[in-house]
Amino acid sequence: MLWQAARLRSEVNAMLTRKMDGDSMLFYEGNTLVLAVVETDLDGGILMALQGELRSELAHHIQDELDAFTTVGVKVTVDFKNVTFVSASALNALLISQQLIDSLRQGQIVLRNIPDATYRKMDEIGLTELLMIED
């Protein structure tokens, strides 16, 4: 049973392709762009603008990017303005990155432009108390 779950996860990940384009990470399913992650400088930190669907199978990519910056003390502002879907796994990835920051006592993650439905879900499960959210 466990091997079937691992095989299914592998097949799902195999359908997505990651491409780098300058300061952008682009994730495709076939020829369809699923998620774009565009990173730019922002007041001594990084702005990570997301566009598209933050699916479960992409959560670890976002977490890896956040951790790479925050473990060296960089502030990362994550902009959800153009996000159309956020999975529970993606929310968990944000929480795990925040816990790493808390343990290292360096770096910072700030979330902004969170869609109303996502904010309500985050509030229901207590994430709005644990994560820094900019109005």
What are these model-predicted stretches?
Residues 2-38:
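Non-catalytic signal-transmission and effector/linker regions of two-component phosphorelay proteins
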Residues 5, 13, 30-32, 47, ...:
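Generic N-terminal initiation segments characterized by hydrophobic and/or small/turn-forming residues
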Residues 8-14, 36-41, 54, 69-73, ...:
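A broad, low-specificity signal for short, low-complexity segments enriched in glycine/proline
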Residues 21, 29, 43-44, 72, ...:
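Feature targets compositionally biased, intrinsically disordered low-complexity regions
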Residues 25-63, 82:
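STAS-typified acidic loop motif
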Residues 56-131:
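Amphipathic alpha-helical interaction surfaces in cytosolic regulatory modules
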Residues 134-135:
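Intrinsically disordered or low-complexity boundary/linker segments at protein termini
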